C-alpha cells in the first residue's frame, strides 16, 4: 500500500472521529436548523455558485439563523436584522475574532493587519492606530484635495468622450478613479505617473488577490488538507500572487525610504506608519514592524481599490434603468448646486437630500461586499434562542437582509423614496443596512469610502446627461454579478456622456 493511500485512510479515520465527536457534543445543544449534510464534505455542495445567492436561497428554506457544516468547520449564517444585531452588538465582544484561512494568513503577513487578524492585544493596538492616526477626521479632511482632484480628472476625460459622442466603459473609468485616490492617499503614488505600477497591472493584481482569497482550499475545511492544496496547485497559485503583492508593497516602501525623498505637505498613510515605526518607544509596548505596515496597506489595497468603484457603477446601472429616478436626482443636484458650476467639492454634498437616498438604496440592493467577512465565536453564545458553540464561524448575509420582504416593500425594486422619513443609515448603527459592517469589526475606512462614492456619483450626475449607445435599450442591460469577496457587475456598463453646457 502506498504512503499516499495510507495518508488518505488516516485522514478519513480522523474526519470520521471528528464528526462523531461533534455529533455527540452537539446532541446536547439547540443548534440552528440547516440543510441535510453529506458524509465528510457536509454542506459544501450547496455553495456551488456565488455564495451570497446560494445562502439567500437556503435562507428562504431554513430561516434567518442557519447552520452549515463545511467539511469539519461549523458555519452559522445570519440573514435578519434582529439576529445581526445580536451578533454585531449584543455579542460583539464574544464573536469579534476571525477564523484562520490559508489565504488570509498569507496575504495579511501572518495576521499583521486589521481586517483578518484574530482578536487580541496586537489587533487592538493596530485598530487604535488606524482609528487615531490613519483614518481620523483630521486625516480624512487632509485628503479631500486628492479626492476632488481625481474627480476633476474624471470629468475632463468624460468631457473628451462627450465631444466625440463615444461610449464610455464606466467600469474602467470608475476603477481608475477609485484606484487613483487610494494610491495617492495610501501609497503616495500617482497612478498616472508612477514608475512601477499602472492602472492595468493594479487592476490585475487586485482581481487575482481577491479571487485567490475566495478560491476553495482543502486546508480551510479538512485536517491535513494542505497536502491536497499542494497537489491541486492552490498553494502554488497563492504563493505566486503573494509574491507579486509583496513585490509591489516593497517597491512602495523602498520609494518612501529613498534618501532625500520629498515628503508631501500631507503625508500619506505609509509616511505616517514609517514615522511611527521610527519614533516608537523601546519599552514593552506594542512594536510596529515592516510586516505590520505591509499588512495594513494590503488591507487598504484589497478593500479600497474596487469597492467604491463597484458601488458607483451599480448606482449608475440602476439610474439608467430607472429614468424617473435619474431625472429626479439630477433635477435636485442641478437645482441645489446651480447651473453654472465648473467644479464640485465635498462641501456640496451636505446640501443634497434625494441624492443621499439614492446612495442608501444602492447600498441596500447592491452591497459591494454582500457577505461580511466571517467572525469566529470566542465563547458559547445564544443567537435568537439557538446555541452557537465556541469556535463556530459566523457570517452575516447583508445581501439577504437587504432583500427581506419583512423589512422592505417590493425589495427587488430600486426605490430611493423608501428611505424618506426613515432614520435608517448605513454607518453601522442600523442593522437593516450594513454595507460596512458594525461593531468592533466595522470597516475603519468607511468615511473615506462613503466620500469617494458620493463625490464620484455627484460629478457624474451634475456634469453629464447619460444615454445608451445607439441600438441598445434598457432591456439590454445585464445585471449578472461576478466576483469573490467584492461582487460587481459582470458585464461593464457602456454609456454615452453628454456634457451639459
Swiss-Prot record:
This protein's membrane topology, according to the annotation, is: Single-pass membrane protein
Q: Which residues cross the membrane?
A: 1-21
Q: Per the UniProt record, which EC number(s) apply here?
A: 1.14.-.-
GO CC terms of this entry: cytosol; membrane
* Superkingdom of this protein's organism: Eukaryota
Reply yes or no: does the keyword DNA-binding apply.
no
Keyword field? Heme, Iron, Membrane, Metal-binding, Monooxygenase, Oxidoreductase, Transmembrane, Transmembrane helix
Compartmental location: Membrane
Q: Where does heme bind?
A: 443
| Co-factor requirement | heme
The terms under GO molecular function for this entry are: heme binding; iron ion binding; monooxygenase activity; oxidoreductase activity, acting on paired donors, with incorporation or reduction of molecular oxygen
- Using the UniProt record, name the top-level EC class of this enzyme in a single word: oxidoreductase
SUPFAM superfamilies this protein is in? Cytochrome P450 (SSF48264)
| PROSITE patterns in the cross-refs | CYTOCHROME_P450
| Similarity remark | Belongs to the cytochrome P450 family.
Q: What is this protein called?
A: Cytochrome P450 71B23
Give the organism the record lists: Arabidopsis thaliana (Mouse-ear cress)
The protein's gene is named CYP71B23
